């Protein structure tokens, strides 16, 4: 068998199946590789073995070689430990961004080269174009499925060695193609959420690694409302899981998380989704990553997303001396959350992004002041 020039990341889902089929139909020399990034705990929550069987079946139908690699150790060291540390520090991380940077476009790419390939392909909904002497990361044609948000940490070296064969397709088109070509994954449900959590209750999963520290739930006026099982388990804007029943002299309206103070172990809530405590017009990020290798300018305007699938928000970006960003939004933003990703766009092009460090929301300023006083519970 000839040495493959392209290794396709086979997840066992319909997206990677069609990606492999399209390349194969173009007579590219390809092979498939299934990555195991998490060691199953025996509860079958990740469906990893089922996904592996589906990947094997698709490779068999296409007549291409199948490879398997276990990256669970790398995932634990480079993604999961960071995930836990962020929650322990009161932030809400985005492990998919790290997984792409550290696993799929680092270890997987290295493995593909060891197998003799010079490029990799994945089933991401994004596009890559080369013009003006550099590679550009663009949104996928299907905006409802676009995954450039999770790919903003990629750089020129990775883009030069990567193909996104389904980036020009709508999801409905893709499923039709899969059905017409007889791929066994054509009707398979899309995976959602974080694989290592699967279908389990998020709080129960996190308790295995971060011990519960119950404390008070208070309103903005410091009035005690109820008790919480641990501030780690909640994020800004969260409504579900608070277990706040009827509160005396309060209307029967839903409660929303508006902040958390690790120093006092207090979770703050309010009954208004548009609470001023959830509003911000400014944020500061950690040092940014730029797809091109450098920012467009010291100060520039663009659009931003502070969460996946958020509508584009106009903003002004100032690059600080340490590489971090000050971002001023044209409109007030809701529940901008430290630890999440700020991703910047110029039209359909993803410029890059950074982890959100802090905002000008009232309780977030308090959290930032107290964070340095709090010991890391993982130590």
UniProtKB/Swiss-Prot annotation:
Localization: Cytoplasm
Annotated GO molecular function terms are: ATP binding; tRNA binding; tRNA-uridine 2-sulfurtransferase activity
Here the disulfide bonds are 99-195
Q: Which reaction does it catalyse?
A: S-sulfanyl-L-cysteinyl-[protein] + uridine(34) in tRNA + AH2 + ATP = 2-thiouridine(34) in tRNA + L-cysteinyl-[protein] + A + AMP + diphosphate + H(+)
Keyword Flavoprotein present in the record's keywords: the answer is no
Extract the ranges annotated as region (Interaction with tRNA). Answer: 145-147, 307-308
* Location (main, coarse): cytoplasm
Q: Does the keyword RNA-binding apply?
A: yes
Q: One GO biological process from the UniProt record?
A: tRNA wobble position uridine thiolation
Q: Which UniProt keywords apply?
A: ATP-binding, Cytoplasm, Disulfide bond, Nucleotide-binding, RNA-binding, Transferase, tRNA processing, tRNA-binding
Q: Where is this region: Interaction with target base in tRNA?
A: 94-96
Transmembrane regions listed in the UniProt entry:
none
Active site residues according to the UniProt entry: 99, 195
Q: Name one GO cellular component term.
A: cytoplasm
Residues at the site labelled Interaction with tRNA: 124, 340
Q: What is its EC number?
A: 2.8.1.13
Where is ATP bound in this sequence? 9-16, 35, 123
What is the recorded function of this protein according to its Swiss-Prot or TrEMBL entry? Catalyzes the 2-thiolation of uridine at the wobble position (U34) of tRNA, leading to the formation of s(2)U34.
Family, according to the entry, reads as follows: Belongs to the MnmA/TRMU family.
Protein name per UniProt: tRNA-specific 2-thiouridylase MnmA
**Taxon lineage:** Bacteria, Pseudomonadati, Pseudomonadota, Gammaproteobacteria, Lysobacterales
């Amino acid at each position: 068998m000839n040495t493959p020039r392209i290794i396709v990341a086979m997840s066992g889902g319909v997206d990677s199946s069609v990606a492999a089929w399209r390349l194969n139909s173009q007579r590219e020399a390809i092979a498939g590789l299934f990555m195991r990034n998490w060691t199953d705990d025996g509860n079958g929550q990740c469906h990893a073995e089922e996904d592996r069987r589906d990947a094997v079946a698709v490779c068999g139908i296409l007549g291409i070689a199948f490879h398997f690699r276990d990256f669970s150790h790398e995932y634990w060291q480079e993604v999961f430990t960071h995930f836990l540390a962020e929650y322990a520090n009161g932030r809400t991380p985005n492990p998919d961004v790290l997984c792409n940077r550290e696993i799929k476009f680092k270890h997987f790419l290295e493995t593909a080269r060891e197998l003799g390939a010079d490029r990799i392909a994945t089933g991401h909904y994004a596009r890559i174009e080369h013009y003006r002497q550099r590679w550009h990361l663009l949104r996928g044609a299907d905006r409802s499925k676009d995954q450039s948000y999770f790919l903003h940490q990629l750089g020129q070296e990775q883009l030069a060695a990567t193909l996104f064969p389904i980036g020009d397709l709508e999801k409905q088109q893709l499923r039709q193609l899969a059905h017409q070509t007889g791929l066994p994954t054509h009707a398979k449900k899309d995976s959602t959420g974080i694989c290592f959590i699967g279908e389990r209750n998020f709080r129960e999963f996190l308790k295995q690694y971060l011990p519960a520290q119950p404390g008070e739930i208070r309103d903005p006026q410091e009035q005690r409302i109820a008790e919480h099982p641990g501030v780690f388990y909640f994020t800004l804007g969260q409504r579900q899981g608070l277990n706040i029943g009827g509160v005396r002299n309060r209307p029967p309206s839903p409660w929303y998380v508006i902040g958390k103070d690790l120093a006092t172990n207090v979770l703050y809530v309010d009954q208004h989704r548009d609470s001023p405590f959830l509003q911000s017009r400014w944020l500061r990020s950690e040092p940014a990553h730029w797809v091109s290798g450098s920012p467009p300018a010291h100060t520039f305007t663009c659009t931003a997303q502070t969460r996946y699938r958020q509508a584009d928000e106009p903003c002004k970006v100032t690059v600080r001396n340490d590489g971090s960003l000050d971002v001023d939004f044209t409109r007030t933003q809701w529940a901008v959350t430290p630890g999440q990703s700020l991703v910047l766009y110029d039209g359909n092009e993803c410029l890059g992004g950074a982890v959100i460090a802090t905002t000008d929301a009232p309780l977030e300023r308090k959290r930032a002041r107290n964070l340095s006083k709090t010991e890391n519970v993982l130590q």
